[in-house]
């Protein structure tokens, strides 16, 4: 599976992110605007740099600007989409089959919510996209999945309905179970569940769920 890691300009734990990249060995790395600062600090080289560069450091711009093997897309700062969205769409155009966003969380809640919204591009294109930081893994799913306890990202699994209702939600292997439940929005029912079996199943008939695996 051709994996693309996109580093964007939100909060990022350099140690975690560098280890994640080294472990995953992605076929493609993209820096979205000030995400290039992470690559510069850690002496890593992205394949692509995309953005309007309103927040990237001059040092990073100068350093990577002299490297001929990096491809650049300079965006107009007056635009309708974010640098992160442009990077995601470019990754898909380049043949990515899986996308991970690093640096997509942080103090700007508007950017975080916007980045979660962008996970839906993965559903539209049948490509899994996830947001990962040192404490969370966030995905958006339109069909059931299996979570293996030995491979889970964090102790807690939270489910948030993205559509008005997620019909027929069934949870097995969890501490708190559901059986063909119509899971509607504007409630906190799905927060902080836990896997208690070797594997847990999330199944539903219709709708879209946000799945967050979290650890303290």
PLM region spans:
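N-terminal beta-strand-loop-alpha-helix module at the start
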Residues: 1-63
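General beta-strand structural signal in soluble alpha/beta enzymes
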Residues: 7, 30-33, 51, 73-74, ...
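Short gly/pro/ser/thr-enriched loop/turn and capping motifs at secondary-structure boundaries
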Residues: 36-38, 56-58, 81, 108-109, ...
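Short phosphate-binding loop-to-helix
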Residues: 71-93
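Short Gly/Thr/Asp-enriched flexible loops that form oxyanion-binding sites at enzyme active sites
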Residues: 106, 110-120
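Short, acidic/small-residue loops that bind anionic groups at enzyme active sites
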Residues: 121-137
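Long, charged alpha-helical interface segments
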Residues: 136, 141-216
């Amino acid at each position: 599976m051709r994996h693309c890691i996109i580093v964007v300009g939100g909060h990022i734990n350099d140690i975690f992110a560098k280890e994640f990249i080294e472990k995953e060995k992605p076929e493609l790395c993209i820096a979205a605007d000030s995400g290039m600062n992470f690559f510069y600090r850690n002496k890593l080289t992205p394949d692509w740099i995309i953005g309007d560069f309103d927040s990237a450091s001059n040092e990073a711009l100068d350093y990577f600007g002299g490297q001929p093997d990096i491809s650049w897309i300079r965006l107009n700062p007056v635009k309708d989409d974010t640098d992160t969205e442009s990077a995601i769409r470019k990754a898909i155009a380049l043949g990515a089959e899986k996308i991970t966003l690093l640096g997509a969380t942080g103090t700007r809640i508007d950017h975080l919510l916007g980045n979660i919204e962008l996970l839906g591009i993965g559903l539209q294109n049948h490509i899994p996209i996830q947001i990962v930081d040192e404490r969370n893994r966030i995905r958006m799913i339109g069909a059931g999945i299996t979570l293996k306890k030995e491979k889970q990202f964090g102790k807690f699994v939270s489910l948030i309905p993205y559509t008005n209702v997620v019909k027929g939600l069934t949870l097995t292997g969890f501490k708190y179970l559901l059986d063909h439940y119509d899971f509607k929005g504007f409630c906190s029912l799905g927060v902080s569940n836990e896997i208690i079996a070797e594997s847990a199943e999330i199944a539903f008939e219709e709708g879209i769920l946000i799945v967050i695996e979290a650890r303290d």
